[in-house]
């Protein structure tokens, strides 16, 4: 595919997380697609920074010398927009493209997560490596006009190009000469000595750029020009040799090729993962201008995107410091080869090194299915690098037997281009799992409600769809790379099975299928000038008996610009490091410190000019600083760090500048402002001892306790360290910074903590279980804790059945065995659990002093007795939960009593005949109603049915809350709930809650009344005048099929209209329904909703809601389609549009009825003709014969005749006759054109007055008549010409009108005219002097054109119409002429 008009294009096929590229990419996905690439070798954009952009730069400063306006698409990960009933696709991933003058990155990724991830195109970045080597300029003499001098430069230079910014200034003429139309050639005024060389750091730094595609150049280190060598001396007096040669043998590279699992899915998918190519390239000094080297990649690799325009993105290699081109690129895609040809740059510089960082992609075309150990290789120069990967494609989306998959395979978007907005292709696999499906249907739609800026579109004007059947045994390419030569093109079979619908959609009816199909959708983008449009296209497959399944694809695009030119600015930077030995000098093994804030001030104005935060490796860089003195201040040091000594040693790039220092920028970057910090370390600890006398003080004879766990935490409670005490009870935490710490001692088993802080000696007392220790510039060895051995006690008593419910243990009351009793500490933690023995006794042993919680589990079927009865705590009940205290003795007083109560619940179900929700005396119960009792957890306890009196009852119930559910009896409806204020008489509804609290509850009742039924229906009538209203004269249509659907879309009734057009559905409940009228054959739906609801037509499908009433307003009307187009056109006559009114005539098909004149229908139009008459004046008809005079009428006539053209005088010919009829006055009619009002004719009857008689003058008045009236003359002839005459006479149009009406036949009469009228329609054309063609199509109930049977070619049809029209017109004119003669006599 060729690049069209060099427009910026967007494409995608490949998924790479290329960040910091010139064109940011956003991507919303829904499907799987194959991968291609978008990678370039631009080595910087000179003055124009290539940066990741989230938005488009609207304009560049006037000083900008070059700008690039590009569009890129972003990677989108989101939940697949599937609508499976599952409505979401799983795991399919899709890729999006990024595109710019340098790069394009593409890919399909399925919509799985509603999030946006930036994916960028390829950007070139200059290496920031610190190195002792740098490309140096080759010596020249003054004759060569080479004045470039490069000074030595050392130090750290992180992300040099990434952070470069430019102060825009108006470029000089010299600078303008350097500016090319393309952004990559813009010049940057940065000297070559700003770049360092280090191969390893080069590649690493490129990696730090977040997978962007870089091609980096390292310029020479030396600053002094080399002595002139032989080659350069020769260059001064003679041109360089033009012979070019392959110098692959002079190119050395250190290359890695790595498979990247971009989404960490543990599988490698061409549509979403990629290959990372990193290489350091060294150019031998023997290389000269014109020489070239190559990069070749295997056929399993792609390096440009889906967009055929992307091939231009293989860019030249440039020096980012001065914009010079080092090597030009040429891409031979057929042979997988990139050729770089060196410019004279290599003649002027030695030791040229380049570092590249590509993201390249796997070619799905060569990997059609899952495969292990697929080889990928890249050869740079003569050195080949190879890797392998196991390729796994995502599974197709499946639901039951349905399966589907899709991908965008080509996208070219031209933002802002109205004439060519671009196009895209989507491939959909239908039934790729090759199942037998019934009634299969596919819907493809460029619509999703979450993406209103969608620029996709599907409609029959711009969309082309090809459909292929997959042969048996054929394996589809899982990367959606389809070779249609292997498939069977069945597109023609779907011509009548393809329907374009709303929401930019198309539906394909596959019917019953037994094989897979490939659907290829090619369509255009909608025009947009949006900076961030989206493209979303869904595909849904459904079939009989299976869940539908959906997939889709989405892309997002972002427009960006870049460009600029400016004066030279420099950078300040260096390093913050942890000076572990505190000597103030950076040494090996000492690491950088991140997140330190560095602020730069202009030392003269004290103005803040820049700020940065150190990276994880401790480096920082502040750009855009002109020459001057700057104060560098470090702040926000990590907590606990101190500053190392400043200005140690004699190397300012390795010493520490301290928290604040002043440095100078003078014609180059200053990378010497650094800071060393360190952490001082201290100890914390003491002793854990057994305090045998429990006095809280360490006595001489008391010994330490070994093995005690001690935990150290920071102020936020985070555990830092844990130790245990040694044999002497000692513990220590080491290497601690200044700060506050928490120390926690774990109580040894069998011990109790002693009293805290007894006495005045803090080194001898106990600090307790938890204490705080502070380190402030010294060790803290004062935190100790004492414990003593804990004595043990018992707790327990008795659980009994309190039969008399008095809350006290009586001598005759027995214990309850098997009751669960739980012991907890004060914090609610369970310590022990036991059960009562056969006598109801329980006991907990081995307890220390303290407060405990005792909980008794209520035995099944029992209720706790009253608590605390009487004064004897040894025999009362403590309840189900109580507190027990042990203080140096056993506690045997904790007991609990229970008893067994039961109750009843129920009431009444009655028929609420008056629907008032209250039980009235004369209302009776309903028997056989099912009532269900549930507990609070909805567990069914019992079910009963009401007795013959409507009563029900649940017995043997314990206290508690219950749910009661009444089942609605068949044929009944629940009455209103809780009416009135008597809870025993109202209805509690279908579901209610009943509480039993020490008494029966007999208040839960429910009322029902018999459910009323309703009817729905009305009338289907023949709308003869097509006005969409039922007129008294219009009759019903018999045997029209009417279908009734419920709210779920299920057919619940079908009927046909009776002989009067009436239909009716009965026994309907209140609810929502849909009524569908099946259009009678040969009839057309009339206009809908034109008047009051019970008289207008509601259309073929009507939604209706029945709410407690019948609805007899759902009617529909049809009329018979007109066959003669001629009329319709008559508008033309209406030249004056009055004709258009004449359409109304057309309404008056009545004329048409008159068929004979059927043309007369045309008459109706003819009215319009009449207008046309005025046109006729235009005597186009005149052409037609002298009659032409009469043409004015003739027009109408002419119209009448040759419908086709009649107006078109061509018809007029034949019409001419007809004209001739009208001739008589017709001209006057022409006046009548004014009649064009002829709409009045629309009555077409007015036509009957054929003003012609009136001499048309009258017509002119009657204009209304004027129109077709002239025709009417002939009409007059036709039926009761008398009328027509009268009309003519009547001149008074009034008559004419009446006449016209009278027969409307008049039209018919005017058949001759009518013919002409028909022509008149054609006249419309006639006006244009083009013959009118007969209608060749009708419309079915889907408003789709259907071809009428062919009876000959269009010319013959038109000629016949003209011929017959002419004959009728001639006959009419003879009759009229004879009549006039008689009158003259």
Swiss-Prot record:
In-chain residues carrying the UniProt-annotated modification Pentaglycyl murein peptidoglycan amidated threonine: 1351
Keywords, alphabetical = Calcium, Cell wall, Peptidoglycan-anchor, Repeat, Secreted, Signal
Any one of the GO CC terms: extracellular region
InterPro entries, per this entry?
Adhesin_Fg-bd_dom_2, Adhesion_dom_sf, Fibrogen-bd_dom1, Ig-like_fold, LPXTG_anchor, SDr-like, Sdr_B, SDR_Ig
Propeptide residues are 1352-1385
Q: Where does the protein end up?
A: Secreted, Cell wall
Q: Name one GO biological process term.
A: cell adhesion
Please indicate the residue ranges that the annotation assigns to the motif LPXTG sorting signal: 1348-1352
Domain (CNA-B): residue spans on this chain: 569-680, 681-791, 792-901, 902-1012, 1013-1123
Q: Where is the composition biased (Polar residues)?
A: 62-71, 94-109, 146-155, 860-869, 972-981
Partners and quaternary state?
Interacts with host DSG1; this interaction increases S.aureus adherence to keratinocytes.
Family per UniProt? Answer: Belongs to the serine-aspartate repeat-containing protein (SDr) family.
Q: What is this protein called?
A: Serine-aspartate repeat-containing protein D
Q: Which organism is it from?
A: Staphylococcus aureus (strain Mu50 / ATCC 700699)
Q: Which gene encodes it?
A: sdrD
């Amino acid at each position: 595919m060729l690049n069209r008009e060099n427009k910026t294009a967007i494409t995608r096929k490949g998924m790479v997380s290329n960040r910091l590229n010139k064109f940011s990419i956003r991507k919303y996905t829904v499907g799987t697609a194959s991968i291609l690439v978008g990678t370039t070798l631009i080595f910087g954009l000179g003055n124009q920074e290539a940066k990741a952009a989230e938005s488009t730069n609207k304009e560049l400063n006037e000083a900008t010398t070059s700008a690039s306006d590009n569009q890129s698409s972003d990677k989108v990960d989101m939940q697949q927009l599937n609508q499976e009933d599952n409505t979401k696709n799983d795991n399919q991933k899709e890729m999006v493209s990024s595109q710019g003058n340098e790069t394009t990155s593409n890919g399909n990724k399925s919509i799985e997560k509603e999030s946006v991830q930036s994916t960028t195109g390829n950007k070139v970045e200059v290496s920031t490596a610190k190195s002792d080597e740098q490309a140096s300029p080759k010596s020249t003499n003054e004759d060569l006009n080479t004045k470039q001098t490069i000074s030595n430069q050392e130090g750290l230079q992180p992300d040099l190009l990434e952070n470069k910014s430019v102060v825009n200034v108006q470029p000089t003429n010299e600078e303008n000469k350097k500016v090319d139309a393309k952004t990559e050639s813009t010049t940057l005024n940065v000297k070559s000595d700003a770049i360092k060389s280090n191969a390893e750091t080069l590649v690493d730094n490129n990696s730090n750029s977040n997978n962007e595609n870089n091609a980096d150049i390292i310029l020479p280190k030396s600053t002094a020009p080399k002595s002139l060598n032989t080659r350069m001396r020769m260059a001064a007096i003679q041109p360089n040799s033009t012979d070019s040669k392959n110098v692959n043998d002079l190119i050395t590279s250190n290359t890695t090729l790595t498979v990247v699992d971009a989404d960490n899915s543990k599988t490698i998918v061409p549509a979403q993962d990629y290959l990372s190519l990193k290489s350091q390239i060294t150019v031998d000094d023997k290389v000269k201008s014109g020489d070239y080297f190559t990069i070749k990649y295997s056929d399993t690799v792609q390096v440009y995107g889906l967009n055929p325009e992307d091939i231009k993105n293989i860019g030249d290699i440039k020096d980012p410091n001065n914009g010079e081109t080092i090597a030009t690129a040429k891409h031979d895609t057929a042979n997988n080869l990139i050729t770089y040809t060196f410019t004279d740059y290599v003649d002027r510089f030695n030791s040229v090194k380049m570092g590249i960082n590509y993201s390249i992609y796997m070619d799905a075309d060569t990997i059609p299915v899952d495969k292990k150990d697929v080889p990928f290789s890249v050869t740079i120069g003569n050195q080949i690098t190879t890797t392998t990967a196991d390729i796994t494609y995502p599974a197709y989306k499946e639901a039951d037997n349905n399966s589907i998959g899709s991908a965008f395979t080509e996208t070219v978007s031209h933002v802002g281009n109205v004439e060519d907005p671009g196009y895209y292709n989507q491939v959909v696999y239908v039934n790729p799992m090759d199942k037998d499906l019934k009634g299969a249907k596919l819907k493809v739609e460029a619509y999703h409600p979450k993406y209103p800026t969608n620029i996709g579109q599907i409609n029959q004007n711009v969309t082309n769809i090809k459909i292929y059947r997959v042969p048996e045994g054929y394996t589809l390419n899982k990367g959606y790379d389809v070779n249609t030569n292997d498939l069977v093109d069945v597109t023609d079979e779907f011509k009548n099975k393809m329907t374009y619908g709303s929401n930019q959609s198309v539906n394909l009816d596959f019917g019953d299928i037994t094989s897979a199909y490939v659907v290829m959708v090619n369509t255009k983008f909608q025009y947009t000038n949006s900076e961030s449009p989206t493209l979303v296209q869904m595909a849904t497959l459904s079939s009989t008996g299976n869940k539908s399944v959906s997939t889709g694809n989405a892309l997002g695009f972002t427009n960006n610009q870049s460009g600029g030119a400016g004066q030279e600015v420099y950078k300040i930077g260096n390093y913050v490091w942890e000076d572990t030995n505190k000597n103030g000098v950076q040494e090996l093994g000492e690491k950088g410190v991140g997140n330190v804030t560095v602020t730069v001030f202009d030392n003269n104005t004290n103005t803040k000019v820049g700020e940065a935060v150190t990276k994880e490796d401790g480096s920082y860089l502040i750009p855009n600083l002109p020459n001057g003195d700057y104060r560098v201040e470090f702040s926000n040091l990590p907590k606990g760090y101190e500053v190392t000594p400043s200005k140690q040693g004699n190397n300012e790039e390795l010493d520490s500048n301290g928290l604040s220092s002043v440095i100078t920028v003078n014609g180059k970057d200053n990378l010497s402002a650094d800071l060393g910090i360190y952490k001082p370390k201290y100890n914390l600890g003491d002793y854990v001892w057994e305090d045998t006398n429990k006095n809280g003080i360490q006595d001489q004879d008391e010994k330490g306790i070994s093995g005690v766990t001690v935990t150290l935490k920071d102020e936020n409670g985070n555990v830092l360290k844990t130790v245990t005490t040694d044999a002497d009870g000692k513990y220590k935490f080491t290497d601690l910074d200044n700060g506050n710490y928490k120390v926690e001692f774990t109580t040894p088993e069998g011990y109790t903590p002693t009293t805290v802080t007894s006495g005045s000696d803090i080194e001898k007392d106990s600090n307790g279980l938890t204490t705080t220790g502070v380190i402030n510039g010294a060790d803290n060895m004062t935190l100790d804790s004492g414990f003593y051995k804990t004595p043990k006690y018992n707790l327990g008593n008795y659980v009994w059945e309190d039969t008399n419910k008095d809350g006290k243990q009586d001598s005759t009351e027995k214990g309850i065995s098997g009751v669960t009793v739980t012991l907890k500490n004060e914090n609610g933690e369970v310590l022990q659990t036991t059960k009562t023995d056969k006598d109801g006794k329980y006991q907990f042993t081995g307890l220390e002093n303290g407060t405990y919680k005792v909980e008794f589990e209520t035995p099944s079927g029992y209720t706790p007795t009253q608590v605390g009865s009487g004064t004897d705590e040894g025999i009362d009940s403590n309840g189900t939960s109580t507190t027990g205290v042990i203080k140096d003795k056993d506690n045997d007083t904790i007991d609990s009593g229970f008893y067994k109560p039961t109750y009843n619940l129920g009431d009444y179900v009655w028929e609420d005949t008056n629907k008032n929700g209250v039980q009235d005396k004369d209302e009776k119960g309903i028997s056989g109603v099912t009532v269900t009792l549930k507990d609070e957890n909805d567990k069914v306890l019992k079910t009963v049915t009401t007795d013959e009196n409507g009563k029900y009852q649940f017995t043997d119930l314990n206290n508690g809350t219950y749910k009661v559910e009444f089942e609605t009896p068949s044929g009944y409806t629940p009455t209103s709930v809780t009416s009135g204020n008597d809870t025993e008489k109202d209805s509690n509804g279908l579901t209610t809650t009943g509480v039993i609290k020490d008494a029966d509850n007999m208040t839960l009742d429910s009322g029902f009344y018999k459910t009323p039924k309703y009817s729905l229906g009305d009338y289907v009538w023949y709308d003869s005048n097509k006005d969409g209203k039922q007129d008294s004269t219009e009759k019903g249509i018999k045997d029209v099929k009417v279908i009734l659907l419920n709210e779920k879309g299920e057919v619940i009734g079908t009927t046909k209209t009776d002989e009067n057009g009436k239909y009716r559905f009965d026994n309907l409940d209140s609810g929502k329904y849909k009524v569908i009228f099946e259009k009678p054959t040969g009839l057309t739906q009339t206009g809908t909703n034109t008047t009051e609801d019970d008289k207008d037509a509601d259309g073929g499908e009507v939604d209706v809601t029945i709410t407690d009433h019948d609805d007899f307003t759902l009617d529909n009307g049809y009329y018979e389609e007109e066959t003669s187009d001629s009329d319709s056109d008559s508008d033309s006559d209406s030249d004056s549009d009055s004709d258009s009114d004449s359409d109304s005539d057309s309404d008056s098909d009545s004329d048409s009825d008159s068929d004979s004149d059927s043309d007369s229908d045309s008459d109706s139009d003819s009215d319009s003709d009449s207008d046309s008459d005025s046109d006729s004046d235009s005597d186009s008809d005149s052409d037609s014969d002298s009659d032409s005079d009469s043409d004015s009428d003739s027009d109408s006539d002419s119209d009448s005749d040759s419908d086709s053209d009649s107006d078109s005088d061509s018809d007029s010919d034949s019409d001419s006759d007809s004209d001739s009829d009208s001739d008589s006055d017709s001209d006057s009619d022409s006046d009548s054109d004014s009649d064009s009002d002829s709409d009045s004719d629309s009555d077409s009857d007015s036509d009957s007055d054929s003003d012609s008689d009136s001499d048309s003058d009258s017509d002119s008045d009657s204009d209304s008549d004027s129109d077709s009236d002239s025709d009417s003359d002939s009409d007059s002839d036709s039926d009761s010409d008398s009328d027509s005459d009268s009309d003519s006479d009547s001149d008074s149009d009034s008559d004419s009108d009446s006449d016209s009406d009278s027969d409307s036949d008049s039209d018919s009469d005017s058949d001759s005219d009518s013919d002409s009228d028909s022509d008149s329609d054609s006249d419309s054309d006639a006006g244009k002097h083009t013959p009118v063609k007969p209608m060749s199509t009708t419309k079915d109930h889907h408003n789709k054109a259907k071809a009428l049977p062919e009876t000959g070619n269009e010319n013959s049809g038109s000629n016949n119409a003209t011929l017959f029209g002419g004959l009728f017109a001639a006959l009419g004119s003879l009759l009229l002429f004879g009549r006039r003669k008689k009158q003259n006599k």
